[in-house]
């Protein structure tokens, strides 16, 4: 899993890939600096809307994690950014992804 490998290269630990069905939008569970993360990975050809934000927010609670993140190779719609701000969901867009990839080399 590319996202899981990328997290490992960026000093995340206890990385666990969830099952595909029934995961409530959570693809990966991870930890960094004693903070636990529920992460949804989206590899899309268009910007990410607020459905992903709502899913990961729900999934964070289900898995009892500290932080909810949506990681994507794209950007987020204005509505998604507003939703994420209201629900305290971290948005890691293609710029953040690029920074994470640069940490590998």
Regions found by a protein language model. Give the residues of each.
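Mixed-charge (Asp/Glu-Lys/Arg
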Residues: 1-105
């Amino acid at each position: 899993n590319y996202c899981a490998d990328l997290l490992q290269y960026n000093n995340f630990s206890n990385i666990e890939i969830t099952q595909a069905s029934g995961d409530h939008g959570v693809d990966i569970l991870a930890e960094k600096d004693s903070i636990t993360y529920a992460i949804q990975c989206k590899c899309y050809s268009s910007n990410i809307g607020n459905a992903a934000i709502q899913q990961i927010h729900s999934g964070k609670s289900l898995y009892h994690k500290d932080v909810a993140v949506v990681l994507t190779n794209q950007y987020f719609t204005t509505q998604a950014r507003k939703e994420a701000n209201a629900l305290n969901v971290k948005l890691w867009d293609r710029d953040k992804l690029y920074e994470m990839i640069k940490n590998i080399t």
